[in-house]
Amino acid sequence: ESPICNLENPNTRLVESIMKRVLIFDALNAYLRAYIVDPSISTHGDPIGGIKGFIKILQRHVRETKPDQIIIVWDGPNGSMKRKSIDKSYKEGRKPIRLNRAFHNLTDNEELQNKMWQQSRVIEYFNNMPIIQFMLPEIEADDVIAYITQLSRYDGWQKIIISNDRDFMQICDNETILWRPTKNEILNTERIVEQTGVHPTNMALARSIIGDTSDNLPGIKGAGFATVGKRLNFLSDSRSYTIDEVIEFCENTKSKLKFFTNIAENRSLIEHNYKMMQLYAPQMSVQSKIHVKESIENFECEFNKTEIIGMMRDDGFGELNWEVLKEN
């Protein structure tokens, strides 16, 4: 059952109201999820689950949310470059993404080539749909998505981010919601505070203390959301706290817990992590911001169904139900 339909808290619902709605996809997150789990094979005998699965994911969320606009954002070529220039070990140690099933006719290199082909191909499909798509060189999708949610154009809109990445919790507010598909959960400000004990305005600070193993950013020893939410419970406030204030609190507390000492003695680690994690000020050039803003303002909604059907025929799979996309 859709989480939209079974949420008890009305503040967390994707409200069917006068608010316009923009659906924003963290594209690589969705594509890799589809690529890994969708077993679809083309009539040519090649894996096409990345393409087919991502399109199905898109259709499902369009059905559920009925958006006025759809934006798909990819990590750009060398997208991690800015953060790697600060920390060369950023994102190191990640295991390569592999199919969770074996194809006896594909070598490791052929599987990699197929994955890259499917990604470029699904981008072509979306270019023929009424979708705004971004892939900016040397910029990560997280920064572009964060910037889009800040655009005055979307003031008063409900902004739904589709991603399993918890980094986006920091930019959630009354209008911006994070839908985490693998958890089948929708997070708004209230839910985030309830789950983590931390308000979105203080989320980057809290995560700078906790660290992020997926990005190879170690945190303070013994710090997790449960501990941070309990020991630094003021981070649940909507007021934005600074690293200085947290350090000062830890230095002046009467508690003898090692947790506070560890924070007070590791300011540089926390400051470093904050610089790497924060999305409040997206790491984008002025030119990149102008490009995104103007691309959205000048977008003309088109649906090239004939081209899509031809592509599907070439790629060896049958027609899906496109009407749900055409209506938007």
Language-model region placement:
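Short hydrophobic transmembrane-like helices used for membrane targeting/insertion
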Residues: 4, 15-18
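Short hydrophobic targeting helices and cationic amphipathic motifs
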Residues: 7-10
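Detector for intrinsically disordered, low-structure N-terminal pre-sequences
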Residues: 14, 21, 242-246
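Noncatalytic, basic helical substrate-engagement surface that gates or grips nucleic-acid strands
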Residues: 20-159, 168-186, 278, 283-298
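Non-catalytic nucleic-acid-binding/docking modules located in mid-to-C-terminal regions
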Residues: 63-74, 89, 93-96, 102-103, ...
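Acidic, His- and aromatic-enriched active-site or binding-groove loops in soluble protein domains
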Residues: 162
